[in-house]
Amino acid sequence: MGKESISLEREVPDLGSSSVKVLLISPEDVDLVWDEAEPLIDLALRHSEGELISSDLIPIIKSGEQQLWVAIEDSEVIASMVTEIISYPRKRILRVITIGGKDGRGIDKWYTFLPLIEGFALKHGCTSLEAWTRKGMVRKLNDWKNSYMVITKDLNQRMQ
């Protein structure tokens, strides 16, 4: 995908007097927000199978292969998400790698921004979004289709 500097934002009135913005962070600016974004990514990765840790993402995001998004409310990063454009032989998709938010509140605010993320995907020739997620998130994404399940089996015991 290459390094590109995109600044997308959309203000959405919150229930209170504040507003929330979602920003796509350019690869060159990752270091400016990483200290705030990383703990939120770590929250999401607690539910993973150990495929990666947040620090593994830094060089990939900085190379432009993955994208870092942050939701900001009252000058505070309340949620962060990492996406990646995947080119399958017959289609191109935007995959959500991880999404995490403070106290569970940050994630709920992403739903308002899905059209913005969909627009980014369309701009880059993607025909759909893809995410590997837990059941609770599937229920919240009512216009998404549960296409299949990913199951895992740990083989570490066999290797000992």
Language model feature labels by segment:
Residues 19, 93, 148:
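A residue-level signal for beta-strand positions that form part of recognition/binding surfaces
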Residues 65-105:
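Conserved donor-binding loop and adjoining core beta-sheet/short helix segment
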Residues 47-68:
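Active-site rim helix/loop that mediates acceptor-substrate recognition in acyltransferases
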Residues 2-52:
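Short amphipathic alpha-helix that is part of the acyltransferase structural core
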Residues 61, 73, 119-121:
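Structural motif
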Residues 2-8, 131-160:
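Active-site/acyl-donor-binding loops of N-acyltransferases
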